[in-house]
Amino acid sequence: MPPESGNWLNNPHADDLDFQIEADFVGLMAPGMVQQALEIADKVSHIMNSGDGFYGGAFVGGLYSAAFIENDPARILDMALEGIPAESTFYQCIDDVRKLHKKYPRDWKQCWFEILKKWGSDTGCPKGVFLSFDLDAKINSAYVAMGLLYGEGDFGKSMEIATRCGQDSDCNPATVGGVLGVMLGKSGIPAFWREPLDEIWDLDFEGTDVSLAKGSLYSYNQALQLIEKNGGKVSDMEVTIPTAPVKVLPLEQNFTNTYPIFRDQKDAWMEKEYEFDFSGNGFCIWGNLVCLRGISKGYADRVSKKHVGSEVFALAEEADPYVAEIEVWIDGELDQVSILPMKGTSRKLEPAWKYLLPEGRHSVKMVWRNPDPSQYLLRINAIQYYSENPVKDVYYHN
């Protein structure tokens, strides 16, 4: 339950952009009310994130909110960043974009290079540590900021830059387009981007009775209610939006004294037990439960190596009720029982992790309480090791 579910000690993905890519609604329902947007973000974000992951969503909510009352992307960016603690790495990363934009106002690629060089190493997400993949909120928000600043209000140019920056390059340009859509209004969006939506405007999304038209109306009504709730006025012809000073959010910084030092590519299978030793103060196993019905172990192994992981198989079983129970013993003591559902919508892609152990040598043993090796195996893709002492120039081991 939140906020524990979003805490980095319980969630290796705490700094990821999960909330950031869902936070559009936060600013849309608080038009021009950046402080209220931040308060909503604080309530919702800790379901799945904390620290920089929380700030990523708060930042996006602030962008949308500010875009209702400002028409300068640089000013919108400044307003969205006001509530983020300056001591946080998230703030520092986005602030670097602002500084680099002033230094290289016509060269977004140089800005991109400098940001990647300084902020492009993931710490928590097992899919990205010591790899090129990076779902960390701050660098993806930095690419949003780059699109807004270097795009100079041009809808297509802004989204193109955000896309070409890479990483989560569907969500980042979508955020940029959404913020500019608010700033420009529907009539200000170029026909090239606007007209295709007309064809699907009234079509319900699959599995729902909600269309773009209905969703827009829901959002509009939410915004009016929140405006009135905060002392604003709504009439048939006019809306008066109340504003309030922005308060800086509490400081949250994940993975303190926890630096990735080694990635050990295992490509191994656990049928009943699995053991390993390491030196440091933490570990995170990237892997998942795999159902062998309809596929062979060899096929699963080949696909896992090709895709740098077996995540594809964790998404495959939508109705399987099996739940694996894995005991995790650290230094001879039972630390946790990891619950791994086979059902795709309840999947868990890290069988076990532990941070902030005493620095030193540790042993880990996993024991499967309810194994069924004829139907289920646990894939161990890789293990990331952590230390309280950062190291340089160590990237990957296979």
Regions found by a protein language model. Name each.
Residues D236-G280, W286-V323, N389-N398:
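Glycan-recognition and processing domains
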Residues Q36-V44, A58, L197:
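Short, conserved phosphate-binding/catalytic loop or strand-edge motifs used
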Residues K306-P390:
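Beta-strand-rich ligand-recognition modules
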Residues M1-N10, A14-F19, N257, D393:
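Accessory carbohydrate-recognition regions in carbohydrate-active enzymes
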